[in-house]
Amino acid sequence: MIGQYYSAITPFSTGGQPVQIYSLVNEGVPIGTASSLLVNRFLIYQLVVTFYALFMFIIRFKLLYAEVRLALPFVVMGCLINVIILVMIFGFLLNEKFIRNILEKSIKILYRFKIVKDIKKSEEKINNTLLDYKISIEELKKDKKTTLQLILVSIIQLTIGFSITFFVYLALGFEKGHFIDIIAIQSLHYMAVSFMPTPGTAGAAEGGFYMLFKVIFPKKILSFALILWRFIDYYLRVLVTGLVTLIDFICRKRKIPIN
């Protein structure tokens, strides 16, 4: 819950993991174990959400191409970024030197454009991150049962999250079944906007919803559907997780057992 709150309010959802590590360490979990747990979770989640969206993209390509062709470049770009990230991470196991060379050259290019300020610091950070990923992948390979359980949980989590729009659809009085279409479009919407640098992908999430879901909702209802979906999916989540974070903070200050 605490991680969800900080992920929701920080650019690129970068605030969640450090806070979760801090929270776990405070509970007595060694920092190495805490980091490994979260890296494992991230790897599984990225793997599942990427293949989930790609599968939906394939089975609903005709619908997307016919009705929301203008949004396809954003969807393809989002999918491509996720695939590249996964290829780099898992490719590190197969050819560590090759992946390191690519990343080092990328950092130098970014330095020339003044996007990266300190080359050595950036290289050190990437090397540490790659090492964490390597260790985590080895752990996932050893414990196949837990890995399969994490994959299943991630699929269920994503399906529930992507189903919010379907229940918004029903709440607005529509009865005709569009469940798979909505799940497919919502998963691709997630891929298209997930790398936007604003907290909660603000702006991109709304614009993407409007572009993609016009095939599902009538134009006169689309704005209401957008507002209702955004409130449930983002603002309600921030409210609930923020409240939990506040309670956790108060309990820690007063040293009250949270359990």
Residue ranges and their predicted role:
Residues 24, 129-141:
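A short amphipathic helical element positioned immediately N-terminal to and/or at the very start
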Residues 1, 158-167, 178-194:
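Hydrophobic alpha-helical segments embedded in the membrane of multi-pass proteins
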Residues 48-50, 131, 153-165:
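Core segments of transmembrane alpha-helices
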